Regions:
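Histidine/cysteine-enriched polar flanking segments
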Residues: 1-144
């Protein structure tokens, strides 16, 4: 879900246009402004090589020994859309997602770029890697 539909603030949603469409979007978003986006940065050569040269051989050896692991798997490039909203104007985004950063900045978001070194091999992005947060703000209903 985090790499497909991201509610940015009341009335504005970021949508992965390769996964979401007008046909499958929940009606609750009909009146919202939509940012359709599909230009994520590809998985880097460094990460692909790390997977091929390190993780895959270890996964094979573990399997041979009778153990199961997720070392043979990588996240899709769409994990780059998995970012964290701090408040309705501020988001933390993987620094490699330059196109996404530009789109968000064009919509007047303050973007805090951070390096997620092993984002594709860990199975999640910034939002997935974040512990529970407590916001000091008033509770808002995004869908009324």
């Amino acid at each position: 879900l985090d790499s497909t539909v991201m509610c940015l603030k009341p009335g504005l949603v970021l949508l992965n246009s390769k996964r979401a469409s007008k046909d499958n979007l929940p009606e609750i978003f009909n009146k919202w402004d939509k940012i359709w986006f599909d230009d994520v940065a590809p998985t880097s050569e460094e990460e692909l090589n790390f997977q091929k040269d390190i993780r895959d051989p270890v996964a094979k050896e573990l399997s041979r020994m009778g153990f199961s692991s997720n070392l043979g798997s990588m996240s899709s490039p769409w994990v780059g859309m998995n970012f964290l909203s701090l408040d309705p104007e501020t988001v933390i985004v993987d620094e490699r997602q330059e196109n996404l950063i530009k789109v968000l900045e064009k919509r007047k978001f303050t973007v805090i770029p951070v390096r997620m070194r092993h984002i594709y091999t860990q199975g999640g992005g910034i939002h997935c890697a974040t512990l529970d947060t407590i916001r000091e703000s008033k509770l808002e209903d995004y869908f009324s």
